[in-house]
Curated annotation (Swiss-Prot):
Belongs to the splicing factor SR family. It comes from Homo sapiens. Residues 116-126, 209-234 have a biased composition (Basic and acidic residues). It is found in: Nucleus speckle; Cytoplasm. It comes from the Eukaryota. This is Serine/arginine-rich splicing factor 10. The modification Phosphoserine is found at S23, S106, S108, S129, S131, S133, S158, S160. The lineage of its organism: Eukaryota, Metazoa, Chordata, Craniata, Vertebrata. The gene is SRSF10. The phosphorylated but not the dephosphorylated form interacts with TRA2B/SFRS10. The dephosphorylated form interacts with SNRNP70. Isoform 1 interacts with FUS C-terminus. Isoform 3 interacts with FUS C-terminus. Interacts with YTHDC1, leading to inhibit RNA-binding activity of SRSF10. Residues 134-150, 252-262 have a biased composition (Low complexity). Widely expressed. Phosphorylated. Fully dephosphorylated in mitosis and partially dephosphorylated on heat shock. Splicing factor that in its dephosphorylated form acts as a general repressor of pre-mRNA splicing. Seems to interfere with the U1 snRNP 5'-splice recognition of SNRNP70. Required for splicing repression in M-phase cells and after heat shock. Also acts as a splicing factor that specifically promotes exon skipping during alternative splicing. GO terms for molecular function: RNA binding; RS domain binding; unfolded protein binding. Residues 116-262 are annotated as: Disordered.
Amino acid sequence: MSRYLRPPNTSLFVRNVADDTRSEDLRREFGRYGPIVDVYVPLDFYTRRPRGFAYVQFEDVRDAEDALHNLDRKWICGRQIEIQFAQGDRKTPNQMKAKEGRNVYSSSRYDDYDRYRRSRSRSYERRRSRSRSFDYNYRRSYSPRNSRPTGRPRRSRSHSDNDRFKHRNRSFSRSKSNSRSRSKSQPKKEMKAKSRSRSASHTKTRGTSKTDSKTHYKSGSRYEKESRKKEPPRSKSQSRSQSRSRSKSRSRSWTSPKSSGH
């Protein structure tokens, strides 16, 4: 009894057959182990090229077993073939055509779906990259840096520096608004106190001006006295002549209105 299970038929299924392998080549190799009924190499219905496998049918099952035992994993026509017993009867050309059509339809449908999926993913990636580039360009064109007048190149600030700058501006504006509100909300008492302090300072300045004028007058009188002291002493004749001239001028002034009355 053979170590292989006896199949219902005497056909061997041969895989990994070379494309240029002919039925005569397989018949020559397998015919060494017994008489062969048929050798069938299926061809593609549309391309008319070998499909990569073949069927070899023996007359006796024992010859098929010997061929399987000796030729499995052997090199034939440049390929390492694999052999096992075929399951079921040999299919007719019409059955093979229908099977090929189903496989072609399913494969083409799968390929179409795969292409559609890939194209959608690529288009989505393109849209995403375009939207990113648009957002980047929009931010660059409408950023406050570009609104400044062109001149010397400024050093680019980082995000943290910009945040600090904004925070400083906000705090400065808040302090301004608080100072304005405080100045507006000052009570009337403070205004009165300010006016009183101003009047007091004004009176002080007046007092100081009076004292300055007095001191100036005193200093002037002292200066006159000192200048008189420094003058040389006059002679008696000069003083007498001056007194006489003064008395004459006085008498003339008194006589002038009387003469006008006459």
